[in-house]
Structures are given as structure tokens and as C-alpha cells.
């Protein structure tokens, strides 16, 4: 397998050729052979061989949809050699490429991913339920034949229908930050009446109420954005609280999904579960933040959030929505069993 310099030159040449040209086909055949045959030496040098294999796989998946199925078949015998991270990436990349492969190959590729790639990932998951990346890979492959397996939104009502109590506040004194500052999320002094605002017993009956996302301005663009369900207002920060009901807490993994453009603090039943101090560029509900499952309780659970906003070109923009998901190990691992 050529090293980085030669790989760069080959990729440059590949991009300059028609995908069906003899030169391009020869280069792609070499990459396929490298992915299939490059030796991965066990031990401390395993990463070197695996890096070369990943380079070859990436080129084929990116440049030649017509050879994705051939790559998936070629890599079957190597699945046990790959690290969990590499195997997870390969499964995700092959699954992501499925819509682009020739229509006549798509069903075979998806069956191959479910029948031959999913089992070794499940085996690894039995011993590592703490890896959200591994869980997501198994969920994605399981969804090919059982879309209901995997993460479940917690609560008896959809998060989009949930009512939040919220209030906004503008920093004062030394907490004020110029609008041109992009990194804005920070601790600020709260008024005395907001002491304990994140605790389950706090009285928020005087706050405004509405559904999420709570927002102001346009986060994203006209083609990619989530519509604000409730107006944020003019202040820089928002505090928001809601509840959800559970009949059972027998989840092996719990995670929090967040739509945000600036930083936030999240509390579950009074305990802070996550703080994010930076910003996001793309409107999406993030894949999820691992959360201590022991914080959940039967009955009413309390979710509290403090979020910030930003002022690009002096236009006020902020958006926040949060919900919780749970996963049962048995439901996921048994989902692919044949009757």
C-alpha cells in the first residue's frame, strides 16, 4: 500500500479521470486489493495497517458507488481483525453509501450488512454497552429489518408536544458581554428569586409556557432549519423546565438529545448531566450525550435547561430543545434473532 504521498497522487489522478476510464478502474482495483489484503499486524503496530485499510475503503466508498458491494464482500473475512472503532466506521460508511449504489445491488448490500456485519458488532456490544458509537452502529444495522428496535424517546408524550415553563434574563454588570464576542455561554449571576431554579421542587408557575424549540431569529438557513415553536424574546439567556412520566426505569443506557446553536447546562432531576460552552453551526438534534441511568425514577422526572444565544451581525439568534432517550440491551440484542 503506498504511503500518504503516493496516496495523494493517486487520488489526484483518480479525480481527474472518468470513473469508467481504464486508469480509474486500475486505481480502484488496486485500492480494493489493498483493503482486502493489507496486513494488519496484531499488537502495537495494528493501527498502522488499519490506517492503510481505512484509506483504501474510504476512497472506494467515496469515488466508486459501483464497487461498494464488492468492498463489503471483500471485507467480510477481515471483520474480526478490525478494531471496534474501524468496524463501526466501516459499517456506518457502507450503510451511508447504500442509497448511491446501483439499484440492483442495494438489497444485496443491505442484507449483507444485516446478516454478516451486524452479528460481530452485536458480539462486541454485549461486552461494551457504554460505547454510544457502537450502540448507534448496531441500531442503524438493526433498523434495516426492525426499525422499532433501539433508542426510545422517554415520556408518555412526544417531546414535540411537551409543554415547557420558561423565563429569560439579560446579564447585568460584569456579566455583560459585547455582542461581537462569539463564544458567549458562561456562568452569570442569577437573581435571588431564581435560586434553585433547576431543582424539582422549584415553583415555576409564574413563568411563561410553550412548546420547544424555544428560539429567536433563524438558526441555519432557509433550506435547513427547525421552526421555533415558542418565541425566546430579547434577552440573552433562557431558563426552561419540563417534566416527563415513566412507568419503568429498566434502561441499560440513557442519553440526552439537544438542538442548540450556543452553549447550555442540562439538569435531570436536579443533577447537572452536561455543560456545553461552545457553539454549533448545523441545526440538528445531536446524536446524544451519555447520561447516568440511575438519575431516572418512576413517575415524574424533571428536566431543566439553561441556554444562551448569539448576535451575528447584531441579529439575535438562539434556539434550544432537549429530550431524553433510553435503550434496553435485551431489546436491541434480541432484535435480530430469527424466529
What function would you assign to each model-found segment?
Residues 207, 236, 244-270, 303:
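Aromatic-lined ligand-binding clefts that engage carbohydrates, nucleic acids, or primary amines
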Amino acid at each position: 500500500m503506498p504511503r500518504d504521498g503516493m496516496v495523494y497522487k493517486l487520488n489526484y489522478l483518480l479525480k481527474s479521470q472518468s470513473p469508467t476510464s481504464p486508469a480509474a478502474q486500475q486505481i480502484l482495483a488496486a485500492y480494493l486489493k489493498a483493503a482486502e489484503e493489507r496486513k494488519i499486524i496484531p499488537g502495537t503496530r495494528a493501527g498502522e495497517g488499519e490506517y492503510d485499510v481505512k484509506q483504501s475503503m474510504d476512497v472506494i466508498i467515496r469515488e466508486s458507488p459501483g464497487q461498494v458491494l464488492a468492498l463489503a464482500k471483500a471485507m467480510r473475512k477481515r471483520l474480526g481483525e478490525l478494531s471496534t472503532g474501524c468496524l463501526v466506521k466501516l459499517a456506518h460508511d457502507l450503510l451511508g453509501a447504500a442509497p448511491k449504489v446501483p439499484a440492483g445491488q442495494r438489497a444485496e448490500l443491505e442484507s449483507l450488512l444485516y446478516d454478516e456485519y451486524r452479528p460481530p458488532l452485536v458480539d462486541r456490544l454485549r461486552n461494551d454497552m457504554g460505547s454510544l458509537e457502537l450502540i448507534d452502529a448496531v441500531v442503524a444495522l438493526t433498523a434495516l429489518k426492525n426499525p422499532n428496535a433501539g433508542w426510545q424517546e422517554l415520556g408518555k408524550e412526544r417531546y414535540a408536544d411537551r409543554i415547557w415553563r420558561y423565563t429569560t434574563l439579560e446579564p447585568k454588570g460584569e456579566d455583560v458581554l459585547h455582542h461581537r464576542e462569539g463564544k458567549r455561554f458562561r456562568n452569570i449571576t442569577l437573581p435571588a428569586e431564581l435560586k434553585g431554579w433547576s431543582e424539582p421542587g422549584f415553583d415555576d408557575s409564574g413563568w411563561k409556557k410553550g412548546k420547544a424549540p424555544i428560539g429567536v431569529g433563524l438558526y441555519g438557513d432557509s433550506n435547513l432549519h427547525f421552526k421555533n415553536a415558542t418565541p425566546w424574546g430579547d434577552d440573552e439567556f433562557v431558563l426552561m423546565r419540563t417534566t416527563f412520566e415513566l412507568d419503568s426505569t429498566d434502561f441499560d443506557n440513557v442519553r440526552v438529545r439537544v438542538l442548540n446553536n450556543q452553549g447550555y447546562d442540562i439538569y435531570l432531576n436536579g443533577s447537572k448531566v452536561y455543560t456545553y460552552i461552545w457553539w454549533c453551526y448545523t441545526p440538528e438534534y445531536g446524536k446524544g450525550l451519555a447520561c447516568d441511568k440511575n438519575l431516572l425514577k418512576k413517575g415524574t422526572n424533571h428536566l431543566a435547561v439553561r441556554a444562551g444565544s448569539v448576535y451575528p451581525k447584531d441579529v439575535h439568534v438562539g434556539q434550544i430543545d432537549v429530550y431524553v432517550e433510553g435503550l434496553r440491551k435485551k431489546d436491541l440484542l434480541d432484535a435480530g434473532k430469527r424466529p
